[in-house]
């Protein structure tokens, strides 16, 4: 194989390489054996056409495209490796010569990884706005949240207040004409929940069971039903019941109802304090890691970030998100339907942060390279087993999905992140 690379501009160039006749001839033979099985040529049994007759009738060139399709991927990969390139986007391939009896010549316009000039990335001073201490208020807030989850709705005689639930019938109309979807019976509506369009729930506050209220509202300009958007409507609303939330007493019995592993309210508070402390510690560590990496990226200089890398990052992020949905048993089409979004919306969402993520990835990779980080066979095996456990997969499945090089890359990246983070100090 002959390989050459010519720089055209920063992070771009043309890779020229050949596929030798030593590789071409056996591949042409393989393609011919496959093709002749389906050939019907008068005077010959199907699948028994001699090669010289094929070449005479169809020309050896008829086999070239299939042979090229088979040979090109490995030839390109070998050429990239021999040229010592780190290609970061799909190449633009052009077959420049496929002469009979000659080596085939291919050119590939490639985008290469930009140079990263590292600044300080160890022993950084960072600031984080995360509180590690667990306060009594934190514990009480969590208990109160669980207490409210156990609350019951009881009928009240007094007028409805925000936070109450009303059971209502309603009939909506615009200019005296009822519209589709504007009617409901025995509907439970939490006042202040924001379930209905703005202004609806507020107009029921202060009214009691048995009353009928004319609720006048205006549909938002961006309302999903375009025929209703921006229009004023009247909802004749009858209140059947007003219910208030009744929370259980704050005592040992409540504690046992919340968590069967505790006996007293004091036990529950202590358990929650430990859990909150662990969660806050994790949040604090994440904040330090993020701040340290951001600082390392700010200290580095990246020589002209290729636009193609940003596109690749968006594509990777979208695929990762959709893959996670499917692993959770969620159909992507159903997700888009429920959220009222499209794949283009998802693409645009990741586009906004792709440049920052790409720069971060480049700097971390540069740190791993500068430190000479590698991954042992033992570390790779441990990583495979951890991924299998995390995603409830068989070890063999993970090994089939991820190459050793991919796993090694992930491990060295983790080591670089750990180095940046562990040597950082918080101001």
Swiss-Prot record:
Protein name: Trigger factor
Enzyme Commission numbers on file: 5.2.1.8
Highest taxon in the source lineage: Bacteria
UniProt signal peptide: none
Gene3D superfamilies recorded: 3.10.50.40, Trigger factor ribosome-binding domain, Trigger factor, C-terminal domain
PPIase FKBP-type domain segment(s): 163-248
Domain notes: Consists of 3 domains; the N-terminus binds the ribosome, the middle domain has PPIase activity, while the C-terminus has intrinsic chaperone activity on its own.
Lineage, uppermost ranks: Bacteria, Bacillati, Bacillota, Bacilli, Lactobacillales
Recorded family membership: Belongs to the FKBP-type PPIase family. Tig subfamily.
GO CC annotation, single: cytoplasm
Catalytic activity: [protein]-peptidylproline (omega=180) = [protein]-peptidylproline (omega=0)
Location(s) in or outside the cell: Cytoplasm
GO aspect biological process, one term: 'de novo' cotranslational protein folding
InterPro entries named in the record: PPIase_dom_sf, PPIase_FKBP_dom, Trig_fac, Trigger_fac_C, Trigger_fac_C_sf, Trigger_fac_ribosome-bd_bac, Trigger_fac_ribosome-bd_sf, Trigger_fact/SurA_dom_sf
GO molecular function, one term: ribosome binding
Gene that encodes it: tig
Role according to the record: Involved in protein export. Acts as a chaperone by maintaining the newly synthesized protein in an open conformation. Functions as a peptidyl-prolyl cis-trans isomerase.
Major localization listed first in the record, in broad terms: cytoplasm
Pfam family, one: Trigger_N
Keywords tagged on the record: Cell cycle, Cell division, Chaperone, Cytoplasm, Isomerase, Rotamase
